Amino acid sequence: MTKDAAQPVILWFRKDLRLDDNQALNAAHLSGRPIIPVYISEPAPGAGPLGAAQAWWLHHSLEALDTSLRQRQGRLVLASGEALQVLCALIRESGAEAVFWNRRYDPSGISIDIRIKQELEKQAIETRSFGGQLLHEPSRLMTGNGTSYRVYTPFWRALEGAGEPEPPLDPPAKLRLASELAKSEPLESWKLLPMKPDWAKNFSDLWTPGEHGAKERLRAFVEDALDGYKENRDFPAKQATSMLSPHLALGEISPARIWDATRGLSKRVSAADTVHFRKEIAWREFSYHLLFHFPKLASENWNNRFDGFEWRNDDGDFNAWRRGLTGYPIVDAGMRQLWRHGWMHNRVRMIVASFLIKDLMVDWRRGEAWFRDTLVDADPANNAASWQWVAGSGADASPFFRIFNPVLQGQTFDPDGDYIRAYVPELRELGAKYIHRPFEAPRSMLAEAGITLGQTYPKPIVDHASARSRALAAYNATKDSASTRSSPRRAG
């Protein structure tokens, strides 16, 4: 081995906490150089402040990655501070002549990485960045006019037309990990886990963070739930979704690995189910496409006609929504599921978002921030794009006048009330006929179920019909005032 080949390469882990299908890791391995694996806790991370729920996940995910590296006679170096300063210190200490990483696609992360690349190259340090966090680079799929996509369906067609993604890379059988590593900070010193009271105490009942947990979740989904996915996915009481989103959010599994797992299943899984699931993966791709081309997606209306919308932003309403005390059972069940498990079924996410934005007229950005803090799968692109989609202000958004009726949504997608009973125990004894509208149940039936509205369970904080009319009036006023303004912002 040449002298240059013996110099270590720093492998900078970010939101790619896995050994499987890790292009930066594979390139470092193929270089033949000793690898120094490092994770840096940045004071201003690229994707914005780390939410409390995802901090819990990150703690356990880093533990899992460190365990995997120790099984290969290495370990994960933990360091905190400005990434450039940390990397320069590691380079001086180790003599490393290269830094490899997998790309991130949030605006702040992109600018940080560009600066680091420029500064390290001034020092004659090799830097190499790789894809793998998405099926396709956001700049690759463009319209025939060379512009970014603004509507999902043409984007999906373009993704299909791009051909099958490259097969995922298996982890190297052996890794040459550096034997002499820099001192690592204790993970506990980062204080990622909640202090008392431990509001995350129920998370581990549902989740196993780490690469192994991701692989097991994928295996179980493909074997047990992919068949019938299209029909069952909207029903929150059914175990019918992949629940891979938290693993994807921190890169414990790659989208290419998930996509690959759906190949060759035609004998036992219908093509319709496979395609529908792949379309959900493509929605994540579309969200990152939007964020890449419209960097202010998380803070500004994609459609600037909504800039003049008159939000009520009542703090009392917002707090009732956060606590799951709105008096609408499907909304309350969703918000309590979020608090208990750091996750919420996708159909219910749309329902609770519509209720906050349209029934309560609270700015979508407040809901987005709450989700970012309480979701274990918080994702800068998915979160912002989804909230703007519901608000009607986003790309290819649901029209604002499409206002979910929380009672009808509950009756349609939780007809027996099983989801409600799981998360709103006050209503457990109420029959299916009234469980989605206890405020209309006869007093005798409420008494028999042990329910006193306004005491054991809240009365509705808003009348849906009146709230709908109020929201539409505000929307029409905004539409009228914007009639002479410019068209929606183009992504770019």
Model region roles, listed by residue range:
Residues M1-P167, N382, S386, A465, ...:
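Trp/Phe/Arg-rich N-terminal binding region typifying the photolyase-homology
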Residues L25-A27, L62-L65, R115-I116, H136-M142, ...:
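Intrinsically disordered, low-complexity boundary segments flanking structured domains
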Residues Q54, G95, K117, I125, ...:
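Alpha-helix boundary/capping detector
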Residues W57, S61, G210, T326, ...:
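Soluble or luminal CAZymes and related metallo-dependent hydrolases
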Residues I125, G146-N303, D414, D418-G492:
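Glycine/tryptophan-enriched, flexible segments
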Residues F235, Q239-A432:
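Active-site-proximal binding-pocket segments
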